[in-house]
């Protein structure tokens, strides 16, 4: 199998563009897929993350559209080819790659078009050709659906990159015609199904004509995907690209996978040291929850202020508006400075961010597939990368064996930053908590965010898929809470089994008066003080009302009723005492009778014994009688 771009059956300008992008040779997945998909084959492609799948389907799509344009210009309202992406971020990224290819190399007309040249020689009018192949991005949260339709009818794009829901809306519009449809690509197909788009994908497939080419691209092929293949593809060629020809390998050879075992209180100090020492251009730090991303971004920004060469820090999670997420991702991708992206699993799959050298997972994800996709953000397209997961001492060390079963081999980390261990690491963790505690005490809002982040982590951890490894009962919760900068442990149902290990009164250090612990924000502080005053007043009124109610009950009680109750109580007491006395007397009489009977029996026994003794003396012979 040749990996030379010049051996591909595609337009010369496409080959030149790939070389200008710096792709001197094709990756294995590109060399396998492009000739098949550019021809007339449906393909199912299973390849490791970071293997160059995006180029593997965009190049054939562009070539197929070039072939279609030889037959005539694009017609308004006709859909020619579609790339379906599971998320808006991935759709936008795919569209930007497509636009980069088209803008860099796509000519205004194919000068090698034999039909055009022949017609020009014969003096006939050449077919009207579009200036260039066009693409359109269609997704929710960007433009209203009616604007997407308007732009589509006006621009006549040949390649659409879309998310499932918005694409389905477009295809159902009466102005849309699919009779000339050529190619469908399902990118990250397993995730399309995982996110619940199965019904939309089935509807899209049913709307499009059966006479088409379909490419299904995914890192894993599941049973659900096999069912999709049955209804969506015709005699597909399955292409499984293994790295280095090793069946057991699930990640690129250019990507190093490592782990570090730490105490919970040491984790933050180790991560900070690693991000300060490791030589990376861009790094991604994965956190388990949205609340953790918000809090850690602020915390790292504060701790970053004292560095001689501070790095840029960005935060990305699913609770941010789509437009905000896109802006943050664009800034992170385009920055020329050393940068860190703190994110959840929203950025674990599909995103092809250039120059990512380091991935740090502060906690393992809830499933093994996500772990691989997280790691795959580094070491893409042959670039060297390093992925490190931080594990707690104890049960979590078994995670290494779990990943080995999933054909992912993790090795102890020995690179830059690994020398921080033992007493030195413990000292760093102690000093960091002191700094963090001081920072948290400056603004109550920070403690609120730390608390929310810690609580969300505990709930995430308690619902982990691998319950035999990730058990909340085995976790050092005070140490973990200290790494979040908490002042005391919160009261949570998940922490009830850890009561014996809590510090006195749940405080992790010096006791803080929360009544005087204030917000920096004047509006929030004013609201807090009002709420505190209202609470104190309510507590006073509650006690006062309670006392008053008792007093009223006593005051309203009649004297005769009180006397009657006293008499009834006295009578009950006398009756009870009488019963007790009678019982004592009865027990005494019974004991006396029993004693008398026993005495009589003893006397009778002695009389019988004397009689028997006398009789025995009479019966026995004397010595003289012998």
From Swiss-Prot:
InterPro entries with a match to the protein in the record: CTT_SPB4, DEAD/DEAH_box_helicase_dom, Helicase_ATP-bd, Helicase_C-like, P-loop_NTPase, RNA-helicase_DEAD-box_CS, RNA_helicase_DEAD_Q_motif, SPB4-like_CTE
Residue ranges occupied by any Helicase ATP-binding domain in the UniProt entry: 34-239
Localization per Swiss-Prot or TrEMBL: Nucleus, Nucleolus
Gene3D superfamilies reported for this sequence: P-loop containing nucleotide triphosphate hydrolases
Residue ranges that the Swiss-Prot or TrEMBL entry lists as coiled coil: 523-604
Chain location of the short sequence motif Q motif per the record: 3-31
UniProt-listed CDD domains: DEADc_DDX55 (cd17960), SF2_C_DEAD (cd18787)
One Pfam match: DEAD
UniProt-annotated binding residues for ATP: 47-54
Enzyme class: hydrolase
UniProt similarity note: Belongs to the DEAD box helicase family. DDX55/SPB4 subfamily.
UniProt comment concerning the protein's domains: The Q motif is unique to and characteristic of the DEAD box family of RNA helicases and controls ATP binding and hydrolysis.
Protein name: ATP-dependent rRNA helicase SPB4
Gene: SPB4
């Amino acid at each position: 199998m040749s990996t030379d771009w010049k051996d591909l059956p595609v337009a010369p300008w496409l080959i030149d563009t790939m070389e200008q992008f710096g792709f001197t040779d094709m990756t294995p997945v590109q060399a396998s897929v492009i000739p098949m998909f550019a021809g007339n084959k449906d393909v199912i492609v299973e390849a490791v993350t970071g293997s160059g799948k995006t180029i593997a389907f965009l190049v054939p799509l562009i070539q197929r559209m070039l072939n279609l344009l030889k037959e005539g210009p694009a017609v308004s309202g006709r859909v020619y080819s579609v790339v379906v992406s599971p998320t808006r971020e991935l759709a936008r990224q795919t569209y930007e790659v497509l636009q980069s290819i088209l803008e860099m190399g796509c000519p205004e007309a194919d000068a090698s078009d034999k039909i055009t040249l022949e017609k020009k020689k014969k003096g006939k009018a050449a077919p009207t050709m579009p200036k260039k192949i066009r693409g359109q991005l269609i997704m929710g949260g960007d433009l209203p659906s009616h604007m997407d339709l308007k732009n589509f009818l006006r621009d006549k794009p040949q390649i659409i990159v879309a998310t499932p829901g918005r694409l389905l809306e477009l295809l159902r519009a009466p102005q849309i015609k699919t009779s000339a449809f050529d190619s469908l690509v399902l990118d990250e197909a397993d995730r399309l199904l995982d996110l619940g788009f199965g019904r939309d994908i089935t509807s899209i497939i049913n709307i499009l004509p059966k006479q088409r080419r379909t490419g299904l691209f995914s890192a894993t092929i599941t049973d659900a995907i096999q069912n999709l293949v049955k209804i969506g593809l015709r005699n597909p060629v399955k292409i499984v690209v293994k790295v280095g020809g090793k069946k057991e390998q699930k990640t690129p050879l250019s990507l190093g996978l490592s782990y570090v075992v730490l105490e919970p209180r040491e984790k933050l100090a180790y991560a900070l040291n690693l991000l300060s020492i490791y030589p990376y251009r861009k790094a991604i730090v994965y956190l388990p929850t949205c609340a953790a991303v918000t809090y850690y971004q602020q915390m790292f920004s504060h701790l970053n202020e004292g560095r001689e060469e501070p790095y840029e820090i960005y935060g990305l999670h699913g609770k941010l508006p789509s437009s905000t997420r896109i802006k943050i991702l664009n800034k992170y991708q385009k920055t020329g400075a050393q940068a860190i992206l703190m994110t959840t699993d929203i950025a674990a799959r599909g995103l092809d961010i250039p120059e990512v050298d380091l991935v740090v997972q502060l906690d393992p994800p809830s499933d093994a597939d996500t772990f691989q996709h997280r790691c795959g953000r580094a070491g893409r397209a042959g670039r060297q990368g390093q992925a490190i997961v931080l594990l707690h001492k104890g049960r979590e060390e078994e995670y290494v064996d779990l990943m080995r079963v999933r054909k992912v081999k993790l090795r102890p980390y020995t690179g830059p930053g690994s020398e921080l261990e033992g007493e030195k690491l413990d000292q760093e963790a102690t000093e960091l908590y002191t700094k963090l505690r001081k920072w948290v005490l400056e603004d109550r809002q920070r403690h609120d965010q730390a608390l929310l982040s810690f609580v969300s982590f505990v709930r995430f951890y308690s619902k982990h898929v691998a319950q035999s490894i990730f058990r909340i009962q085995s976790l050092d919760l005070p140490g973990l809470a200290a790494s979040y900068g908490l002042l005391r442990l919160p009261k949570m149902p998940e922490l009830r089994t850890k009561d014996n290990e809590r510090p006195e009164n749940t405080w992790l250090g010096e006791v803080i008066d929360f009544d005087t612990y204030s917000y920096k924000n004047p509006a929030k502080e004013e609201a807090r003080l009002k709420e505190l005053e209202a609470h104190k007043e309510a507590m006073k009124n509650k006690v006062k009302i309670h006392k008053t109610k008792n007093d009223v009950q006593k005051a309203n009680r009649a004297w005769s009723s009180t006397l009657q109750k006293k008499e009834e109580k006295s009578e009950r007491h006398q009756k009870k005492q009488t019963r007790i006395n009678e019982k004592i007397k009865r027990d005494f009489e019974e004991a006396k009778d029993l004693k008398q009977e026993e005495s009589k029996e003893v006397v009778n026994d002695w009389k019988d014994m004397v009689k028997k003794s006398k009789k025995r003396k009479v019966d026995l012979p004397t010595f003289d009688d012998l």
